[in-house]
C-alpha cells in the first residue's frame, strides 16, 4: 500500500527525544506529584514554569541567585535553581499559558497583561527580559496575544502583533548571545491569523535565535477537522527545521495522534491531570504486536472502510477508555487500576481514598496517568522510527474502540 508523505518525525529537545510532552505545574511545582516520583517515570523531562508565577516570585529567585552566586565553591556545580528547588534532571520551560487554568487571558500592547483565574499581572517587555536573566530557563517562549479560531482581527492589530514580536526578538537576541546561549527560544505565533508574509520575514530575520514555534490560538474546543485547516495554513509557511509546540486544553489520545501526524514535536496536554483531579484513570491498549503486512495505511484511501482519517476523527467512547474510580462498583474490586499500570494499589483502595477526600488518591492517579502517557509517546516514537506510524494510528483507534459513534 502506498505510504502517505506526512510531517510526523522524531527530533530532539536538548537530549529528550520527540514527540514528547511537558509536565504541567501550579506554582512552579508539578500538579499532585513531586519531582522524585516523576524521575521514576522518566529520566528527564520538560517542566512547565508559567511566566506569571515566575514574575510573581521574581524577588525570591533574585535573592536565591545572589546567595548561591556569592557562596558558590568549586565543589558546587549546576544551576543555582537545582540547589534551591531540586530541578535536577528536568528542563525548565518558561511558558506563557498554563493549560491547567481555564480562565486565561493575555494581552500584549505597551505592557504584557496576564490573567489566570483571579490572579493578574501587568509588566513590561523589560520585566520579561529580567525574568529570563534571573530564572535562566532552558527553554523559553516569547509572549504573543492568544487569538482563537474565528476571532476577528483587524489590520491594525495584526501589525501590532508583528511589531511587538520583532521588539521581543530584538531584545532576546542580545541575551541569547550572552546569558542564555544554551537556552532554546520558542516564538509564539497566532496561527489562526492570516499573517503569512510578515511572519515569514520575521522568522527569516531572526532565524539564528528562533529554535522553535508555538502554535498559539489552538487547543481549545475546536474539532480535529477545524484544527487541521489551521495546521495546513501555518505549517506550510514555517521552516521544517524548527521545533513545533502546541498547547492542548484537553490533549486526549486522538488529539495527540493528530498533532504528531501533522509534525508537532512537543505537546502540552491537560488530559492526564484533568482525569486524576476528577478521580479517573486512563485505560488504553498501547502495544501493537502484529503489523498487517508491515505496510503503512494510506489515510487518504477513502475506499477502505477500515482506515480512519485522523483529521476527521474526534475522541469518542470514553466509557471503557476511562475508569471512573468514584463509581461504587469498585468498592470490592481488588484488582490494580489497569493491567499495564505501574501502581500496585487496588481500585477499591483508591475508591476509598476518593470517598474520604484523600489527596493520596490524586497522587496515585496522576502517577498512573502520566506513566501511561509516557508509554504512549514511547510507542509513537518507536513506530515513527519503524515507518509504521499510520498503521499504529489505525490499530490504536480499532483496539481502543475510539471509532464508535456516541449513542
Swiss-Prot record:
Entries under Gene3D superfamilies matching the protein: Queuine tRNA-ribosyltransferase-like
Gene Ontology BP term (one): tRNA-guanine transglycosylation
SUPFAM superfamilies cross-referenced by the UniProt entry: tRNA-guanine transglycosylase (SSF51713)
Source taxon at top rank: Eukaryota
PANTHER family tied to this protein: QUEUINE TRNA-RIBOSYLTRANSFERASE ACCESSORY SUBUNIT 2
Family to which the UniProt record says this protein belongs: Belongs to the queuine tRNA-ribosyltransferase family.
Protein name: Queuine tRNA-ribosyltransferase-like protein
Organism whose genome encodes this protein: Plasmodium falciparum (isolate 3D7)
Amino acid at each position: 500500500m502506498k505510504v502517505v508523505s506526512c510531517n510526523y518525525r522524531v527530533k530532539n529537545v536538548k537530549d529528550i527525544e520527540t514527540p514528547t510532552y511537558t509536565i504541567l505545574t501550579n506554582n512552579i511545582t508539578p500538579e499532585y506529584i513531586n519531582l522524585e516520583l516523576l524521575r521514576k517515570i522518566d529520566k528527564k523531562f520538560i517542566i512547565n514554569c508559567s511566566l506569571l508565577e515566575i514574575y510573581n516570585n521574581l524577588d525570591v529567585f533574585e535573592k536565591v541567585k545572589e546567595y548561591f552566586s556569592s557562596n558558590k565553591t568549586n565543589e558546587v556545580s549546576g544551576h543555582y535553581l537545582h540547589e534551591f528547588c531540586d530541578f535536577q534532571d528536568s528542563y525548565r520551560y518558561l511558558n506563557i499559558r498554563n493549560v491547567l487554568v481555564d480562565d486565561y487571558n493575555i494581552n500584549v500592547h505597551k505592557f504584557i497583561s496576564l490573567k489566570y483565574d483571579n490572579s493578574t499581572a501587568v509588566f513590561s517587555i523589560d520585566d520579561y527580559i529580567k525574568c529570563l536573566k534571573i530564572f535562566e530557563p532552558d527553554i523559553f517562549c516569547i509572549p504573543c496575544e492568544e487569538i482563537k479560531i474565528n476571532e476577528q482581527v483587524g489590520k491594525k492589530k495584526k501589525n501590532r502583533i508583528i511589531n511587538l514580536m520583532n521588539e521581543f526578538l530584538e531584545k532576546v537576541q542580545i541575551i541569547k548571545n550572552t546569558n542564555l546561549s544554551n537556552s532554546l527560544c520558542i516564538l509564539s505565533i497566532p496561527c489562526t491569523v492570516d499573517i503569512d508574509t510578515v511572519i515569514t520575514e520575521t522568522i527569516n530575520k531572526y532565524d539564528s535565535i528562533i529554535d522553535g514555534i508555538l502554535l498559539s490560538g489552538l487547543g481549545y474546543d475546536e474539532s480535529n477537522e477545524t484544527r487541521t485547516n489551521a495546521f495546513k495554513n501555518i505549517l506550510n509557511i514555517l521552516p521544517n527545521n524548527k521545533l513545533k509546540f502546541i498547547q492542548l486544553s484537553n490533549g486526549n489520545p486522538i488529539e495527540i495522534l493528530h498533532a504528531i501526524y501533522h509534525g508537532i514535536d512537543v505537546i502540552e496536554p491537560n488530559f492526564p491531570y484533568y482525569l486524576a483531579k476528577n478521580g479517573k484513570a486512563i485505560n488504553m491498549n498501547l502495544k501493537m504486536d502484529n503489523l498487517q503486512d508491515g505496510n503503512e495505511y494510506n489515510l487518504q484511501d477513502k475506499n477502505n472502510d477500515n482506515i480512519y482519517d485522523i483529521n476527521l476523527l474526534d475522541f469518542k467512547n470514553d466509557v471503557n477508555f476511562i475508569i471512573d474510580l468514584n463509581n461504587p462498583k469498585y468498592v470490592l474490586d481488588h484488582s490494580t487500576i489497569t493491567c499495564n499500570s505501574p501502581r500496585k494499589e487496588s481500585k477499591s483502595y483508591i475508591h476509598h481514598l476518593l470517598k474520604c477526600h484523600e489527596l493520596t488518591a490524586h497522587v496515585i492517579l496522576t502517577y498512573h496517568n502520566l506513566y501511561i502517557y509516557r508509554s504512549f509517546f514511547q510507542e509513537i516514537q518507536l513506530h515513527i522510527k519503524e515507518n509504521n506510524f499510520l498503521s499504529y494510528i489505525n490499530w490504536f483507534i480499532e483496539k481502543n474502540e475510539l471509532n464508535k459513534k456516541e449513542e
